[in-house]
């Protein structure tokens, strides 16, 4: 976006990785507030219903990163994302919960004119109508990436999508309990499909992750949580 690092301000978060509304930095019309629907380690959701109206009142733009968590809106856990619809823009991935091939991300913008103005690639030799699809993305031409997403949604249907997400959330909770019983530390509340895990020592954590990855049967994603190694399980 062209911002220098001195323009970035990190908001204070609580123990679950959610922005703390009481410690939100001051905002104005130049502010772009980035919120999360599904924190990458814990699966937690920012307090949209409280944070977004405050940002709007200050004239800020609110963007929600919902790479996997935005799909909770289609499940029995929709309450986790209460207020997310108040934002100005959203992003999500199809290759995560929809199981489509990689390169199936999507961006949604409330203000179509603002999006078209930012992405416009018209030239003297290539003009287009106001609603031309080429003016909604950085790429002048691209393949039909949306077909895989359409096929997944058409195949699952609303009920199938809800059942799949509900099942994965339920399985994440079951996995967390099994890991606790096996002597591992589960570091998050498993409200969604993420299970954040640590062994008794950093060495055990790293060894467990590397052994799982080497098995070729399962993938434990590496991460750092509160200054120490951990690994992520995403269902």
Task: Locate the predicted segments by residue.
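Conserved PLP-binding catalytic core of the aspartate aminotransferase-like
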Residues: 184-212
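Active-site C-terminal subdomain of aminotransferase-like
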Residues: 82-182, 187
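Conserved PLP-binding active-site segment of the aspartate aminotransferase-like
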Residues: 34, 196-202, 217-235
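Conserved alpha/beta core surface patches that mediate binding of polyanionic ligands
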Residues: 128-134, 212-219
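A glycine-rich phosphate-binding loop feature that marks nucleotide/adenosyl-phosphate handling sites
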Residues: 15, 71, 122-125, 188-196, ...
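Anion (oxyanion) recognition and catalysis
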Residues: 56, 180, 213
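Conserved PLP-enzyme active-site core in the AAT-like
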Residues: 1-116
């Amino acid at each position: 976006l062209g911002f220098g690092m001195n323009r970035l301000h990190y908001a204070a978060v609580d123990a679950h990785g959610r922005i703390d509304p009481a410690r939100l930095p001051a905002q104005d019309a130049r502010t772009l507030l980035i919120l999360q629907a599904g924190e990458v380690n814990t699966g937690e959701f920012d307090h949209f219903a409280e944070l977004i109206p405050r940002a709007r009142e200050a004239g800020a733009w609110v963007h929600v990163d919902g790479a996997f968590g935005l799909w909770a809106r289609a499940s029995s856990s929709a309450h986790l994302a209460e207020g997310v619809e108040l934002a100005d823009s959203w992003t999500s991935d199809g290759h995560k919960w929809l199981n489509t091939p990689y390169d199936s991300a999507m961006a949604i913008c409330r203000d179509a004119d603002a999006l078209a103005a930012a992405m416009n690639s018209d030239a003297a030799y290539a003009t287009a109508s106001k609603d031309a699809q080429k003016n909604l993305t950085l790429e002048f031409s691209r393949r039909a990436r949306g077909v895989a997403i359409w096929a997944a949604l058409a195949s699952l249907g609303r009920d199938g999508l809800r059942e799949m997400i509900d099942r994965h959330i339920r399985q994440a909770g079951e996995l967390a309990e099994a890991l606790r019983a096996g002597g591992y530390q589960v570091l998050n509340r498993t409200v969604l499909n993420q299970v954040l895990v640590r062994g008794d020592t950093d060495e055990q954590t790293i060894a467990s992750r590397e052994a799982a990855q080497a098995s070729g049967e399962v993938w434990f994603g590496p991460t750092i949580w509160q200054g120490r190694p951990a690994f992520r399980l995403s269902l």
